[in-house]
Amino acid sequence: MYLRRIKNPEQLKHHSPGEFGKIMGLDRVPEAKCLRTKLKEISSQEKSWQWNMSLAKKWAHSDENEFYYIDGHVQVYNGYKARLGKKHVARQKLCLPGMQEFWVNNKEGMPYFYITGQVNEKLLEMLEKEIIPTLLKEVPSKYTDEQLDNDPDLPRFTLVFDREAYSPAFFEHLWNNLRIAIITYRKNVNNVWDKNDFNEFAVDIEGAETKMLLAEKSTKLNNISLREIRRLSAEHQTSVITTNKKLSLESVAMHMFARWTQENFFKYMRQDYDFDRLLQYAVEQINGDVVVVNPEYNNITYRLKKIREKINRRRAQLFKLQEDNVNDNLDSTPKHLKKQITIKQELDDFIQQEEKVLSQRKQTAYKIKIDDMPENVKYNKLNIESKRLQNIIKMICFRAETSFANLLSEHYNKSINEKRSLVKSIINSHADIIPDYNNNNLVVRLYSQATPRMNDAIQKVCKLLNDTKIKYPGTQLTMVYEIAT
């Protein structure tokens, strides 16, 4: 369903139930209400996290991955049942209510798992308390303890993230206590390196070679030695730091700037898989001991900000009137003085309000427990079980689609720009399903595509798939793919 870009059960009504059902080996596809009921039954078992961890172990083992890309994604909430904390949504440049998901991907953008924050957790907090313990416990490491003991510079694995989790003390803890390396952007860069320090390197990013001007120096932050790599482009120097001592200069740059594959993953999933859609709208309570910023404190701070804006405007008006009074003739002085008196009175009133609001804010706690919040503003959260279930299915679809696209790219000239659009075209094209019981085959005959080069690429991929001898689930029929040309 998701591979066909059918984004919710209701959209099944616009597809032939008989023909769509045959793809799954059924007489007809389930009706929308029936499918929702099935999803609800599966979600009620609360096994989605175990399923995700099982898949993450399998994927990480097959990838032999040692680089994990971490980033947050905000699922904006526009409903009224839940009271969610506001998060900054970078793609909209606004603070909006929503749920924050922290995703773990590889450098190709392929997802492993994600963890949902409860209220307004930051990336650094989630790394320390949730993501790293999960990686250490659930996901197999590429290197054994013996290999780590024999090579003191070898990291267990490397985390790649943006400036949000920047903390030299945290980097020191990761390397000294856990042997985990990091690659991230450096904050507060206050010097410029000489242009003669930079040399041109060829860096491979997403299969395309990019020329970069790079330089490297060692630096020390919080008693931990780091490698600092800078990229020079258009008079701007982008600083990257890492505790990984094994990587070459261009490899560090490649891994840092390949972080955009994760951003592209979020964008692609939103557009093609309706990533942020909810199948259920149930609300759950949050642990009452969780400490959050007091909403009343925020409200007072907002009032204080508005009062100070009015004070600044009155001061600017008063200054202009005083200047005009000096520059004008004596006949205009009474008029200017009258205006100055009015504005001075308003200014004094606002200053008194500022002192009153400041006093009120001092008496208000900056952070409180959720249990101490008034009932009408107390935070809760959306049920994440059904959302996780559908996200796991979408992860599987994305990985399957990407694997198929990579197979196509070996036989297709415009693979970088068009391979995903070709995969979508194949998935949505018509095909004949022909059981051949005499030879124990299930023949899938794809209809011809728009151009001969597309057909040629598909034919070569069909041969690769046929060599795997995959059997249709629940039968002894071997899948045989061919294209009608």
What role is predicted for each listed range?
Residues 12, 31, 35, 64-75, ...:
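Short, conserved catalytic/metal-binding motifs centered on acidic residues
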